[in-house]
């Protein structure tokens, strides 16, 4: 699963702050729903169907990574903490999903897993971290929903940590923009990872799934 989705063309530009009058009309994009937000003020500069509930696909991993980052910053996790790849999280190399390719029963550090999620969009890394933090993915999804509620994501429901299609798993462009704003603000130590263009693990080099880089 890639991060290309009909949910949002999500552009948050922390190094610029400009008034809404800069945009005389919303840009013409093919996306079903999008939001352009000023990071510093939270002002929505342009949008289309920003409150429409859609499947967030791999953008789900923004919340997965946000929770991991907050656990690292609070000391509940350490960067060098070893995380095991159980069979329930292990990626078998299917072409239908993106993977970090941690070997079955192998380990990676929490920081490596975070990079595997952010850069490689690894479903295996997302599920392994969910199990490591919460015991199972379902309990982790509950944590995701609690965090979404805390930061004001009122039209979001998470069922899993990866964004794989599931009934009741949805979000909106506006909610995801709000989450992105919190990642930049609350996880400033780890935010530079989002701009890293590639990551190599287990001898496998993969490029960042973010097509804007």
Question: What feature does the model see in each segment?
Answer:
Residues 153-154, 165-213:
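Domain-terminus/edge residues, biased toward the C-terminal soluble/receptor-binding domains
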Residues 1-7:
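Bacterial N-terminal signal peptides that target proteins for export
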Residues 11-20:
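Hydrophobic h-region of N-terminal signal peptides that target proteins for export
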Residues 7-8, 65:
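Short amphipathic alpha-helical "recognition" segments used for binding
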Residues 10-11, 68:
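Enrichment for repetitive, rod-forming helical segments
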């Amino acid at each position: 699963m890639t991060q290309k989705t009909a949910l949002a063309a999500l552009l948050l530009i922390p190094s610029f702050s400009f008034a809404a009058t800069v945009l005389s009309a919303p840009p013409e994009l093919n996306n079903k729903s999008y939001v352009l937000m000023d990071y510093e003020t939270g002002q929505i500069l342009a949008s289309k169907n920003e409150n429409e509930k859609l499947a967030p696909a791999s953008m789900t991993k923004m919340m997965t990574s946000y929770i991991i980052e907050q656990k690292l910053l609070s000391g509940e996790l350490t960067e060098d903490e070893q995380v095991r790849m159980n069979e329930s999280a292990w990626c078998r190399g299917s072409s239908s999903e993106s993977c970090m390719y941690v070997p079955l029963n192998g380990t990676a550090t929490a920081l490596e897993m975070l990079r595997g999620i952010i850069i490689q969009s690894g479903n295996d890394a997302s599920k392994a971290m969910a199990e490591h933090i919460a015991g199972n993915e379902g309990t982790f999804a509950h944590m995701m929903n609690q965090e979404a509620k805390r930061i004001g994501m009122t039209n979001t429901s998470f069922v899993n940590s990866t964004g794989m299609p599931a009934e009741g798993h949805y979000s909106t462009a506006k909610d995801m923009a709000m989450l992105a704003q919190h990642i930049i603000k609350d996880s400033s130590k780890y935010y530079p990872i989002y701009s890293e263009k590639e990551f190599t693990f287990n001898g496998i080099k993969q490029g960042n799934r973010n097509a804007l880089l």
